[in-house]
Regions:
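PP2C/PPM-type serine/threonine phosphatase catalytic domain
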Residues: 1-245
Length: 245
């Protein structure tokens, strides 16, 4: 009989990077409630920072105060809609916040089950049996072109449109997130991150760091350090969650 997941452990780190004047990333986590969130804000002035913080705060508020009347994924989709509406309405009523938005990647766990939810190009990965796999699909112009076979990976990396995302929270009155259902096993290691990590580090490099099997806070620090060493062109956020027997 397969060993069941008994509990989870988590750690996170965020850093401004070496080029940006401020950090517009945000994250939230609650091991008790099985809720983990990373957001990467965008917009002029402090708008990106406001958008990402609003999204994280709303996701955490709603998903750590559930009454059990609905399924976890139903509550999560409602939380995404609420976060989107809050950012959108705030931007409509503040001229200096016009156009602000944020990406979102969320991991939800409940016993041995899990769900990843994403909007934008912040990613969710799973490491199982020493193999790293990207679970989410980037909502970005170049990644969608790659998936349709209209552009290869090298062309995507060189494209002037590589930073253009096709979905975000708060830029429209409604948004449709992608949802991925997971069956978790002891030893699974999940990574949620902003593109400040994945634009600097290729997946094999991330996999190599995670294979070091260090304490979670130390692995988060190693990931941030490696991204900064590679240039640190953007804010960097990583959140690790491990399923344990």
């Amino acid at each position: 009989m397969a060993t069941a997941v008994a509990h989870y452990a988590a750690a996170a780190a965020t850093d401004r990077g070496r080029k940006r004047p401020s950090n517009e990333d945000a994250f939230g986590l609650s091991v008790e409630h099985g809720v983990y969130v990373v957001c990467d804000g965008m917009g002029g002035a402090a708008a990106g920072e406001i958008a990402s913080s609003l999204a994280v705060d709303e996701m955490m508020r709603l998903l750590t105060s559930r009454d059990g009347a609905h399924t976890l994924i139903d509550d999560a989709e409602e939380a995404v809609a609420s976060a989107n509406a809050g950012i959108y309405l705030r931007a409509q009523h503040s001229h200096n916040l016009s156009g602000m938005g944020t990406t979102l990647v969320t991991l939800l766990v409940e016993d041995g089950r899990g769900w990843m939810i994403n909007v934008g190009d912040s990613r969710g990965y799973r490491m199982r049996n020493s193999r790293l796999e990207q679970i989410t699909l980037d909502h970005s112009l170049v990644e969608e072109q790659v998936r349709m076979g209209r552009m290869d990976r090298l062309e995507a990396q060189r494209s002037p449109f590589k930073n253009v995302i096709t979905r975000a929270l708060g830029t429209q009155s409604s948004v449709t997130p992608d949802v991925f259902e997971l069956e978790n096993e002891p030893g699974d290691l999940f990574l949620l991150c902003s593109d400040g990590l994945t634009r600097e580090l290729a997946d094999p490099t991330i996999e190599w760091i995670l294979k070091l099997d260090l304490p979670l806070p130390e692995m988060c620090a190693r990931l941030v350090e490696a991204a900064n060493d590679a240039g640190g062109h953007d804010n960097i956020t990583c959140l690790l969650v491990r399923a344990e027997a």
